[in-house]
Design a protein with these regions (language model features):
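Flavin (primarily FAD) cofactor-binding/catalytic cores of flavoenzymes
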Residues: 2-49, 53-55, 84-223, 229-399
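N-terminal glycine-rich dinucleotide-binding loop that anchors FAD/FMN and/or NAD(P) in oxidoreductases
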Residues: 59-84, 225-239
């Protein structure tokens, strides 16, 4: 097994040596590599960073999974009970490192793949850092849902001299103690950062909201919200939307007076559009108590102030933009006609695009049933598809 912390690069493949190349050593890439290995197929995972789980290492300190330990484990290795029900960021990283060791996965770090092309013989040619050209029988793209921080093109943003950073740079509340902070965006990241700032001693925390989210309790009477997500994921959206409304009224207080009315769009309809519910880890109480103040959407920046959609002008000490991420796939595979108009893969899991058989994607959706659970399911589907369609061309493991 290649050292998962080394920077050694793979050698150009011999014509008879055509592994499946997996791009990205996060949970999705590792799960696919394990599923392929379980079928006796050689998978080489290429990771641009110096270690596995790089994006997880860069998350904010207080992060814990919003999905349960049991439903967050990857195929073939349970998460230890000592991790608790809601697994911490650091324990996720430890688990990924152990996963590589336990399954003897072939990981090569320090290699960034810039472009994937169809090879003349029907395989795949990967153009990577250092001028490397690697040839594989199939390619799995697992570069991650949160790949490239997205910052809206707000008027005046470039000239704004105040402290501004994307949530990807946020680690903890210590630098903001005693300061006035505006958090922009109320997805799970923005909501949790706002709570972290309040608990960490920020003097004032305001949360800028453009689209009101659905808020759900992470667990109700011991029943995790994820279990509901698993149960309803294949039901008609209109049915789930109707079912969710009375449940929300029972479990989540009306926050309209504090600037967070209940959404007009249904819960599953919104989730299908990519906006999963915000799981409450303290936001409800913080908003009810006034410690987190909800304000209007940001419209721009002017004269050192933040302009809101309702005409308000704010002068916070710091702005943290929890405005999401781009998939960042255009340079890698955009020329292959495999992305939609929003830059997302047109297929996932065991389905390859009609224009690019042998090319697979995992981890580019945000399912209500839990990302890690769906990555595990995708891994099995991809391995099955590769074995069926590209199996005779893939390098086999010895034994």
């Amino acid at each position: 097994m290649a050292d998962s912390t080394a920077s050694a690069a793979p050698q150009p493949a011999h014509p008879a040596d055509r592994p499946v190349y997996v791009i990205g050593a996060g949970p999705g890439g590792l799960a696919v590599a394990q599923a392929l290995r379980a079928r006796g197929l050689r998978a080489v995972v290429l990771e641009r960073a110096g270690h596995v789980g790089d994006s997880w290492r860069r998350h904010y300190d207080r992060l814990r999974l919003h999905t349960t330990r049991r439903l967050s484990a990857l195929p073939g290795l349970a998460m230890p009970r000592r991790f608790g029900r809601w697994v911490s960021r650091d324990d996720v990283v430890r688990y990924l490192e152990k996963y590589v060791e336990y399954h003897q996965l072939e990981i090569v770090t320090g290699v960034e793949v810039f472009r994937v092309e169809r090879a003349s013989d029907g395989g795949w040619l990967l153009h990577a850092s250092g001028g490397r050209e690697l040839t594989g029988s199939a390619v799995v793209v697992a570069t991650g849902y949160n790949h490239t921080p997205r910052v809206p093109d707000w008027p005046g943003r470039a000239a704004y001299a105040g402290e501004f950073r994307h949530a990807a740079e946020y680690r903890d509340a210590a630098p903001y103690a005693g300061r006035d902070v505006l958090v922009v965006g109320v997805g799970n990241t923005g909501a949790e950062i706002a709570v972290d700032l309040v608990e960490g001693g920020a003097s004032r925390v305001r949360l800028s909201v453009r689209t009101v989210p659905h808020i759900v309790r992470r667990s109700t009477a011991g029943w995790p919200a994820q279990y509901n997500g698993v149960l309803i994921r294949r039901l008609p959206a209109r049915l789930v939307d109707r079912m969710a409304r009375p449940l929300a009224r029972i479990s989540v207080p009306d926050l309209s007076a504090r600037g967070l009315p209940r959404p007009d769009t249904g819960l599953l309809t919104r989730a299908a559009e990519g906006a999963v519910p915000v799981q409450d880890v303290g936001l409800i109480d913080a908003v009810r108590s006034g410690r987190v103040e909800v304000v209007a959407a940001v419209d721009g920046f002017e004269d050192g102030k933040v302009l809101l959609a309702d005409g308000t002008r704010l002068a916070p000490d710091a702005v943290i933009a929890a405005t999401g991420y781009l998939r960042g796939l255009e340079g890698l595979v955009g020329h292959l006609d495999v992305l939609d108009d929003r830059g997302r893969p047109v297929v996932r899991g065991g389905s390859a695009p009609a224009a690019a058989p042998g090319l697979y994607f995992t981890g580019f959706t945000n399912p209500i049933s839990g990302m890690l659970r769906e990555l595990s399911l995708d891994a099995g589907r991809i391995a099955k598809a590769v074995a069926k369609h590209e199996g005779t061309a893939v390098s086999r493991l010895p034994g």
